[in-house]
Structure formats: C-alpha cells, structure tokens
C-alpha cells in the first residue's frame, strides 16, 4: 500500500525533511485518503505488508548499527567503512545516519493506521481481521522497543498522523512509561488477537513471535517471573508438520545449515498457514527477497562482513579470546561462526564455503530477530534472577551440549551475578552476529565495565545513540541526549 500524500508530508515535517525529499523522489505517492484505502481484506493485507516493508527498511543497516557494532563482539573492518568505524570506536556525532528515526516512525504510523482502520473492515473470517490487528499491535510494540533501547526517551504517537497539525511536534516521552503503558499492553492485545490456528509464518509475527518480544520486554522491565512464564508458553503451540512450532535444534551441523541455507533466498509468501522453514529454531526474522524488494532492499549480511565485500567489521580479538578460556576450548560453534580470512577474523555464521555460497551472493540472507535458543538462554537468566540456579544451568547445559562443551554446576558459583555472567557469556557466543550483544550489555547495565577498556565508553548517557540533528531542527521540543550536547551537527 502506498503512503498517502498528507501522511508523508506530516511525518516528514515532524521527523526529517531531508528524508522526506528523498522518499518523495523515489516513490510515487497516492492521493487517496487513508480512510478510503482501508476498505477491504485486500487493503488490510497490503497495509500490514507495508509495515513489514518499513521494518525491513529500518533494520537493513540498523540491525548491525543498533545491536552489534557498539558491542565487544566487533572491531573496525575496511578503512573505507568510516560510518561503521565511528560507531564501533564510540566516536558518533549527531549526523550519523544510524541516528535517524524517520523510517521507524513511518513504520509506527503505518501500525497506527492499521490499528485505527482494520477493526472496521468487513472480512469473511473475523479471525483473519483479528490476526492482522494483532500483527499491527505487535509490530508497533517492536518498533517502540527498538526506539527506547536506541535513544531512551522518544516521542510517542499512538494515533495515526493523517494531516498536518501542531500535534505532530511532540516532546520525548519517558522510556519506562512507553515500556509499561504502550509496549507491554500492545503485546498483550496482540496475544489475544493473533490467529493461533492459521498463522504459522516466521517471516511475520506469529503467537510465538509475540511471546518472544514480550519475554524480552519483561526482562528489560526486570519482571523475571513473567518472562519465564511467557517463554514456557511457546511449548504449547503445535506445528502442522507435527511436534512443536518452535523448538531447540540439538544437532550442531543442522544449527549451522539453519544460518547458511534456511535463512537464504526464501520466496515471497503471503500464505500464513504455510511454514516454509525446516528449522523450528527460528521464531521471527526479517525477510529479504530480491524479486520482492528489488536491488535497494538487499541484506547487508554478506557485504558488511565478508572480505569479498566492503567488510565493515571483523570479529574482535576480545571475542576470539573467549574460545581460549578453559571451559570453552573445543567449542564446535567456533569454526562455524568465525574464520580468519584476508587478515581478519570474519563473521562466517551466515556463509558457507571459503567465500560464500551462491545464495549469499544474491544478498538475500534474512536477519533473525528471535530464535528459540535465544529464548532458552533468556529464560535461564530469568531463572537465575529468581534463585533457580539449577534450572537455569540445565537450560545452559542443553545449549552447551550441542556445542560439545561441558557445563558448570550449581556448586561452582558463589553468587547470582556469577551465574548471570556465565549465561551472558553463553549468549554472546551463541548469538554472535544476531544483533543481540549490545542490547544485552545495556539491559544488564554492564556496558561500562565491558566497553570502557575497549573504546572508553563510561559516561552516563553514552549508552544512548544521538538523535539526528535534523530531527531537532525540525522539532524544537526535542532535546538532544545529554552526552551529545545540544549541537546541531
């Protein structure tokens, strides 16, 4: 569904005039009012598809900028990749492209349009209408969840912007308020609306996708018992193929092909009852298909991490040193995750062969947002915080067994912090290159102790990204994050 003319104008005025100009030059714009666009089941489907398209545009580069490049997993790659190096080296200014939130707020506005208009659309099956609405609520929650983790307090819009008014110029809303009063309530609404008997997509939000976001959000809210209970719910959803819809993959070779083959070159598919993935590890991912999105919508997984591309980052020496620790020697994930290639430790998790298989070269590698092992280790952390060390370590053992490693026992730890750090190290290795490590450091407030020796990150406020100067020029009610001052460049 094309963005309506006054929607684009209003959002651009509020958020980024420069981006608006580029957007208008690249895309034809419909003159049809939003209320006239949301009339049929086909309109609803197109409108929801647009949300996923905007999520893909938002995360195409920012998946790495926001979740990976500020962490101890990576070091700068090719000298020509200066944008990435500034983020990695903690030298960001207010004109970084990853500091822009324009596309993210376009996504939020599209979810708001869906939430407003989908309930009034007549459909043959009410369950389909509810499912579209549930996806919209879940995607709005996910968008704001990214926003508060990246910038902290952000402007809050829960109604669609359909015409220009002064109301589009908003101050920033407290991040904890957004988490408590928007993100978690939206996810609870999505939980009640998603069609559990038909929606078996992993490229879209299923009920397990809702629960994955919800569990993650509960961990940020330090609601460990609720996170634990939410992850348990995933075991109740059956697959039409038999067994569970999401589950742990116990074989390391199959774990490897999940990244090199399962995430590659899946066709466009709008049939929610068709689960085209063999791996049940995958819960929700951002899909890339050149036929669907064109050459401007390809994945950066290959270009930014391959020595045959413009390698933006390499795996850091600090990350590699983990495999030298006594209880990590012989980790079967190492050779599947990293390879020394062209004078750098290269992230090879998503690539097969010496350079790449043919599918990688088409740049159609999907980005995993959530998978089941992520949830297991998150649940282990939640249980450790509840004093259930044995149960937490049982979950860790399942993951480490697959990697060919032994696991410490409850008696090997003297404190909850030691158990949590053990789990966080496991998350770091298991989820390398999946946009999770930086957010783990933020959530657990370990970013100072981990990153200060690497890039000097230690001042309060440095953990947030700057707000792009253009947003502040356009909206004087927005105040820059304190670490970056109130400069406009």
Identify the residue ranges that each predicted region occupies.
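Acidic, glycine-rich segments characteristic of secretory precursors and extracytoplasmic regions
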Residues: 2-4, 8, 20-67, 113, ...
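Long, intrinsically disordered, low-complexity segments
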Residues: 20, 41-42, 52, 60, ...
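Conserved, well-structured interaction surfaces
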Residues: 40-59, 80-151, 173-178, 187-200, ...
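Short, surface-exposed recognition loops and adjoining beta-strand edges that mediate ligand/DNA contacts
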Residues: 62-78, 157-159, 195-213, 219-298, ...
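Flexible, polar/acidic helix-loop-strand segments at domain edges
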Residues: 79, 85-88, 317-372
